[in-house]
Amino acid sequence: VQGGKYFSCSAEFNQYTEDRVKELIPLAPLHNGAHLVAFHAFKNALPNVGNVAVFDTAFHQTMEPEDYLYPIPYEYYEKYAVRRYGAHGTSHKYLSVTAKEKYLKDKEHYNIITLHLGSGASLAAIKDGKCIATTMGLTPLGGVMMGTRTGDMDPSVMEFLCTQTGKSVQEIYNEFNFKSGLLGISGISNDTRDIEEGYYKGEER
């Protein structure tokens, strides 16, 4: 999922790629680690077959600085590469290419807004086949509300909850990733089918 600043396209899964994917686990805690496990499983099962890493962040590397930089001290971008990376790029690229082929064949210039809707969700603005803006940010936690993830909110919520509950930043961060979103709001499920069923049963939340 997360290729950070290192990958703007797919890459052979060699030692360099593995090291970068591992380095970027904090930016995609639900995904990068699991993908490394899968990579090693394939490598052990099929040692003579090559592996390629396809990064969900790669498609969004065409964004301009004014669209991916955060309004925080610039040194954090320079030192730690803190910026908007986006996600679901493979999906957004497929949607934009398919829409162009089906509906915009004769258009040299075109604008498309794509939506990736699942337990994780994001939107992207695409101009002439290139991403110019997307909703997810540094990690897949940002953007619109999702199945178990918060999406965007006031950054001070983290500090406030740590102070009020005595929980660590990591504990609250895990709750933002695994216990929030539709699940957190509804108290029922992250699955819209369960939430709809709850609605018809009179569950107000």
Which role fits each region the language model picked out?
Residues 1-31, 50-52, 58-67:
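Short beta-strand-loop/turn "lid" adjacent to the catalytic site in phosphate-handling enzymes
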Residues 18-23, 73-80, 196-203:
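Gly-rich Lys/Arg/Thr-decorated short loops/hinges at beta-loop-alpha junctions or inter-strand turns
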Residues 12-15, 33-38, 45-48, 107, ...:
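Non-transmembrane, aqueous-exposed alpha-helical and coiled segments at domain scale
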Residues 20-38, 80-82, 89-93:
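A gly/proline- and charged-residue-enriched helix-loop-helix capping module
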Residues 62-162:
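Glycine-rich phosphate-binding loop of actin/hexokinase-like ATP-binding domains
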Residues 111-115, 170-178:
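Beta-strand segments within the central parallel beta-sheet cores of soluble alpha/beta enzyme folds
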Residues 174, 181-185, 192-205:
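Adenine-nucleotide phosphate-binding core of ATP-dependent small-molecule kinases
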